[in-house]
């Protein structure tokens, strides 16, 4: 006996159900819309997949499956060098470039390279002069969204993300999440060599180097070694004189983000980045 096919939960069943409904109503499946697409094509295009946990909707089942990893906590992509794991391959590849120093995204104007396309797109605004973020209060325009957010606070005084434990405020939720570990005592990063635990992954990774090869990134100018490629990049500016962080209030440039952030706090009333 062949299994009963009620069509529930299958693509074929869903499509058959749609066909039956259209036959009963007399709809013409092969009638075209204004763009030349038949109705059966439109039915297939509009089929959606909904997450039962949060209600997010996707047009492909594969996207839903990938999204559900956020709720399940599954992180199948693990980088062996540091042990950090990611739910999606794109995040894994992005993290891997921190270790390898790979920067595949190149600016066609000045040949400067970046490890992320989003960083390149932001940087290109220096050449184009584009300032897409405009303050509705004073009319000032900004190239970067982060700088725009910092400026906006000077008008509104809004506290974007506040710690309920100590009242400290932050521009970004990720900064608040990182800060909260101070209060919870959470130390999710454990060294497999000696058993030590760490609150922050960056500190854990630096510690793990004491068991292995030390500092893999070396400055060609002075020979100083670093744990991370971005630390080497930051150090290199002391030789080149590059100052990529500009305060738009006073047109002052900085070689390090920490110095730029300190200057920004002066304008924003002391709020942390």
UniProtKB/Swiss-Prot annotation:
Against InterPro entries, the record matches this protein to: Znf_C2H2_sf, Znf_C2H2_type
Keyword annotations from UniProtKB, A to Z:
DNA-binding, Metal-binding, Nucleus, Repeat, Transcription, Transcription regulation, Zinc, Zinc-finger
Give a yes or no for keyword Lipoprotein in this entry: no
> An example of a Gene Ontology BP annotation on this entry?
regulation of transcription by RNA polymerase II
Keyword DNA-binding appears in the UniProt entry: yes
Give any GO molecular function from the UniProt entry: zinc ion binding
GO cellular component terms listed in the entry, alphabetical order: nucleus
ZnF region ranges: C2H2-type? 49-71, 77-99, 105-127, 133-155, 161-183, 187-211, 217-239
Q: Which domain of life is it from?
A: Eukaryota
Q: Which family does it belong to?
A: Belongs to the krueppel C2H2-type zinc-finger protein family.
**The protein's role, per its UniProt record:** May be involved in transcriptional regulation.
What is the designated name of this protein? Zinc finger protein 80
Q: Which organism is it from?
A: Pan troglodytes (Chimpanzee)
Per the record, the gene is: ZNF80
């Amino acid at each position: 006996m062949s299994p009963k096919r009620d069509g529930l939960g299958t693509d074929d069943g869903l499509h058959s159900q749609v066909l039956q409904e259209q036959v009963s109503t007399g709809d013409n499946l092969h009638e075209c819309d204004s763009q030349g697409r038949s109705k059966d094509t439109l039915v297939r295009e509009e089929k959606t997949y909904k997450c039962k946990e949060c209600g997010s909707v996707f047009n492909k089942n594969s996207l839903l499956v990938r999204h559900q990893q956020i709720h399940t906590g599954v992180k199948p992509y693990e980088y062996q060098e540091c042990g950090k794991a990611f739910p999606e391959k794109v995040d894994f590849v992005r993290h891997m470039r921190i270790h390898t120093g790979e920067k595949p995204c190149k600016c066609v104007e000045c040949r400067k390279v970046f490890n992320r396309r989003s960083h390149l797109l932001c940087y290109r605004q220096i050449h184009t002069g584009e300032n897409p973020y405009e303050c509705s209060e004073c009319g000032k325009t900004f190239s970067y969204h982060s700088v725009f957010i910092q400026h906006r606070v000077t008008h509104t005084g809004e506290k974007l993300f506040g710690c309920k434990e100590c009242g400290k405020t932050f521009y970004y939720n990720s900064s608040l999440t990182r800060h909260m570990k101070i209060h919870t005592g959470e130390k999710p990063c454990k060294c497999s060599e000696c058993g030590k635990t760490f609150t922050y992954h960056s500190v854990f990774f630096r510690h793990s180097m004491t068991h292995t090869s030390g500092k893999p990134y070396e400055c060609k100018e002075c020979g100083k070694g670093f744990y991370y490629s971005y630390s080497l990049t930051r150090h290199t500016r002391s030789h080149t004189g590059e100052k990529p962080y500009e305060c738009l209030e006073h047109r002052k440039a900085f070689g390090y983000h920490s110095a730029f952030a300190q200057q920004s706090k002066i304008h924003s009333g002391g709020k942390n980045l």
